[in-house]
C-alpha cells in the first residue's frame, strides 16, 4: 500500500501559443509543461530601457498529459480566443477564460480514444491537433485517421463587417451524443458552437494517399484546405539505392457537410526525408516542406522551388536539376523550429544547436520569385542560447517566445534596425505587426502587401527580455549535502547536513547541475546570543528592540555600536513589548506594551503618551498591534479594538471611530493596508445592493466578457487606506478611513471557500470560536510585479492565501491551491504549533515582498513574477521571531531568533530560484552531463560529461574502413570526461579525459572493503567507481571499462582554496561489452558488462571477481539493499537476486514475468516487507513484491505484481531513502523512493499503513467522482486508463494519487466535512488530516 506524490513540478515547456485568451487588446502566452497549463501576460518594467517580462496570471494542474494547445475564435465571443487543449488518449478540451472566477472554464470535452482504437489495430500513441485558420474546424489526427470537428462560423455579412477581428484566431469544440461535456459552469447550451465531429480515413479523401506523415491546414483559402505529405513505398537511409523520392504532397479542399474533398494540386517524387509542412500566411503563400537536407516551397499554384542545404541532398534524390544549391551551408535540419515572422517576408528557422537562419522570399507583387536561406549574424542573437528548440509563439510588440527542450525558454523581441518608420506605420494600421499570425488577409490588398515587403530589407536584432526556467531534462541525480559547515558565525548551522538533490539538467552549452534544497539556505553574516528574549524588532536600521515575555523586560541595542545597550529613561523597560513601529520615515518610534503606548523621537525621548486614553481599558491588556502610515490599530484581550491617527507634528493623536455596527462584536486581530479591495463598492454601492436583492448576472457570453476586460481595476482609482478586522466568529471585515458607517465582509471566509466576495456586514448571534490567528492583506511579489494577497494563519497552523482580482464589476479573492500543507484543524497536528506561529510581513527581502512564519518549522512565503505564491521551509531550526535588518554589509536582509535565544543576521540567497516547491540553484557546466554522484568524505561532486566530436569510422584493428566518402561531413561521435567539482565555488578542480568514443555511463561513490584476501577484517574506504562504454562502428559491439579512483587531499593552489582535492587512480580494467550499470553490494562492487554481471572484490593488489551471472540482454539498472540485488533489463523487467559472501555466490530469488523495458528501479521497504518500484519506458510505475509465503509466487520465484501507475512523463532515475514518519513513527526504518523525470519533475513513492490507505483510498474515489477537474479530465482515467486489462485486474490496491487527495485540504469547510462523512460514519475528520500531514511531510527528514 503506497502513495505517489509529485513534489517538484515539471518545468520543461512542451507547448506554447500566443492568443487573445484574456483580453481582446493584448495577447496572452499559454504554456504547457507536461501536466501543467500556465497563462502568462506581458508586462513592461519601469527601467531606463523598456523591458518586457512574463507575468504568471494563473496555472492549472491537469489530470492528463498535454499534447497540444491551439487557439480558436468561436461565435460565442468574437473578441476572445478559446483554447483547444489536447491530452494523451485522444482527448480534446475546449476551454475559455472566466473573468468572474479568474480561472479557466471547460466548455466541452471531446473523447475520441475508443473511436480511434476501434478503427485500428495499432496502439494509440501521440496525436496531432491542427486548426483551420478561418476557424471553420479542427482536426485531431492519429496517423491516417482524421477526426474533424466543424465549428459554427458567422455568416459572410458579419464576416465582412468584422473582417479584421473575426478572422484573427482559431476555432474550436465539439458536441456530440457520444462525447462528454464537462465543466460548463454557466449551464448554457454549447451546441451552437460546433457540430458533430466525424472521423474518416485519409484514403477516403483521396485513394492515392498512403501513410500520412504530416497534415496541416493552409492559409489564404476561403474553404478548409489541407496539405498532406504521405508515402506509399517505405524508404530509409539503408535502402536509398533501391527506393528514392517516395514522398508525395497533395492539397485537398474539404466540404465539411458532405465529408468529401476536391484535389487542388498534387506533387510526387519528393525526397524520403520530408517530414513536416509549414503553412505560410500573408504576405507569403503556400507552404514549406521541411526535410533533413533540403527545403521545398510549394506555392498556391503548385509551383515548387527547392533548396539543397548540405552535401547529402544528392544522395537522397535522383536528380538535383531543380534544386538551388546552398549545400555550402551544411545545415542539418532534423527537428528544427520554423516560424513565419508576421508581416514580413522572412521565415525564422532555428536549428537543434541554436543557430538562427532566415528563409528569405523575394516577392514581386503577389508572386514569389525565389527563396533562399541566410544565416543570421551571431551578433544579432549573441546572448541567446537554445538547445533543441520546440514551438515558437508570436506575441504583441514584436515579441516571440521560444520553447526550449534542453534549456531555459527565452522571451525575445524582434527589433528592426532599419525602416523603423515603416513599422510604426504598420502599427497604426494593424495595431501590432505580430498580432495577426493566424489571420486570413484579403488576397487583393496589394498596397498592404507592398508595405510589408519594404520591411524585408531591414535586419532584425533579437533581444532577450526574460526567460522561463527549465530544470529538465534530468537523466540522473544524487543525494548530497549543500551546507556542511557545522557552525556558522559561531552558532550551529541551521542547514547543517541537510540532504539536497543534485541532478543534471540541459545539454550541450546549456548543460549544468540543479541543486534542489528542501529549505531556504540563508547566507548568515553574523550572530548574537541572548539570555532570555522572545521577540525582537529593528528600528530605522539603527536599533534592535528585544522583549522578554517571561521576565517582563524590554531592551534597546544599537546596531552601529556593536549592539551596545542604549539606556533611555522614557523607554518602557519593565514590561514586555507587544509591538514596535516606525513613524514619519523613521523619525519617530512607537512602543506598545500590554498597558502602555508611547511615541518617541529618534533619541527615544517620549513625545506622546497614551496613558490617559488607556485608563478606560485598565482591566484589559493589549495583545496585538498593527501600524500603517499614521494609523495604529490596537487589540485588547476583551475583544475590543481601537484605531488611532497619530500626528507627530502636533504631538497628538486622534481616535478613529469604527463603524457602529461593530461595537458589540468581538475582534481578535486585524491589519491596516493600502488596497483596491473597496474601490469598486466605494464608487457604486449598488453592486452589493443588487446582488443582495437577487439580481442574476450573466456570467458568460459576449457582453460579460467585454465588460469584464474593458473595465480595468486601474480605472477605479488608486489604492485607499483599508482597515481589516477579524471577528470572534471568524469573519473578516473591511472598511475605509472615511467609512460613513459602511462596513463590508468577505462572505464565507470562515468556511475558506474558493472565492471570497464582498457583502454587507451583519451581526450574528453566535458563540465566538476563533480559529483565525493572524492575517496579512498586502502585496507579494518581486521587483517586477506585485499583487495583493490575503494571507490567513489559523490556530492549527494552516496557511491560506487568497489573491485579489477584478472580475469586471467588483473585486474578489480567489484561493491559491498549489500550497503545501503546514497545519491542520481540530488539533490534528499539535506538533506543528508547539512554538507559536505568527505572520511577519517584509516589504523588501533582497527584492522580494515576502512573509515569514515563526514556529517549530518556520516558513518563508514568496512569489516571483513567473510563479504562484510558494511556501518554503525556512531552515531546519525553529524560529520564534523575525525582523528586517540592513547595515553597511547587508541590504534588505533579516535577523531571526531561534528557540535557543540565538539570533542570526542573514540574507536570502538570490542565486536560488523560488518558482517551484523547493528552492533551486543552477550551476552552469556547459557540457552534457551523463551521471553525477556525491563523495561525502571530501564533500565534492563527481560528474561524467561528454561532448560531440567528429566520428572516425575505424574497424576492429583501428584502421579506417573502406568506402568512406571523406568529401562529405562526418557523423558525430562523443568524447567523455570525468570531472571533480568543488561546492566551494562550483568549479571544476580536476578532470580525467577519456579516449575518443568513450563515455562514463555511470559514476558512483561507494564505500568498499579494501584489504588483502588473507585478512579477516578489511578497511572501509569511500571510492569513486566509473563504468564506461567505448562505442565503435555499427558492425562491432561496444566495449567498455571500469575505473576506480580515490579522492585525495592536496595542498591547494595559491588563491584557490577550492583546489584541495584531486583524483588518484586505484585500478582500471577494460571489459568486453559496455559497462551499463554499477552498484555497491556488501562492500564489493557489481559491474554489468555486456550480458554478464560480475561482482568484484577490491584488494590491496588489484581486483578479484568473486561471483557472476549471465543475462539474456544487457542490464539497464542495478541496485542493492543489504545483500539483495535488483537487475533490470530492456525486455524482461527485473530480477531479484541475493549475494552471499561465504561462499561467494549469487542466488536468483525471483523475477517479474512482465515484459517491461526498465528505465530504473529501486527498493521500498516497510515492516520487513520487500517491494520493488519499477519505472518503465512507457511512463508507468510498477510495484512488485517479493513474498515467498504467497502461494501465487511459486515460493518467491515469481515477483507478485501489486500495482501500476501512469506518471505522464518518462522516468529516468530512482533512489531509495529513509521515510520520515511525522505522526506515528514506525518501530523499524521505512524506506521510500525518489524519482526524476525527463520534464524536470521529481516524485516520491512511499509506503503507508493499512488504516491510512483505506481512508485515503475512499477519499480519493470521492474527490475523483464529485469534485471539479480542469479541462474535464478524469484523474482515474489519467492514472490507470492507458494500462492493459491484465495490469488493471491486479490493481486491487492501486497506488494512491496524492495530487488528488491533497485537493481535500483546499476545499471549503462544508465540502471537507461532507467528504469525511463519506469516508466513515465515525469521526474520521481528524484522522484524515493526520494522514495528509503524514503524506506531506515524508521528505521532512532530508
Curated annotation (Swiss-Prot):
Cellular localization per UniProt: Nucleus
A UniProt-annotated Pfam family: CPSF_A
InterPro entries: Beta-prop_RSE1/DDB1/CPSF1_1st (IPR018846), Cleavage/polyA-sp_fac_asu_C (IPR004871), RSE1/DDB1/CFT1/CPSF1 (IPR050358), WD40/YVTN_repeat-like_dom_sf (IPR015943)
Chief place of localization: nucleus
Ranges of compositional bias, category Acidic residues: 156-167
Cellular component GO terms held in the UniProt record: mRNA cleavage and polyadenylation specificity factor complex
Disulfide bridge partners, by residue number: none
Keyword RNA-binding listed: yes
Gene Ontology annotations of biological process type: mRNA processing; termination of RNA polymerase II transcription
Domain of life: Eukaryota
Keywords recorded for this protein, A-Z: mRNA processing, Nucleus, RNA-binding
Signal peptide residue numbers: none
GO molecular function terms noted in the UniProt entry: RNA binding
UniProt-annotated stretches for the region Disordered: 156-188
Protein's job: RNA-binding component of the cleavage and polyadenylation factor (CPF) complex, which plays a key role in polyadenylation-dependent pre-mRNA 3'-end formation and cooperates with cleavage factors including the CFIA complex and NAB4/CFIB. Involved in poly(A) site recognition. May be involved in coupling transcription termination and mRNA 3'-end formation.
Homology family: Belongs to the CFT1 family.
Protein name per the record: Protein CFT1
Top-level taxonomy: Eukaryota, Fungi, Dikarya, Ascomycota, Saccharomycotina
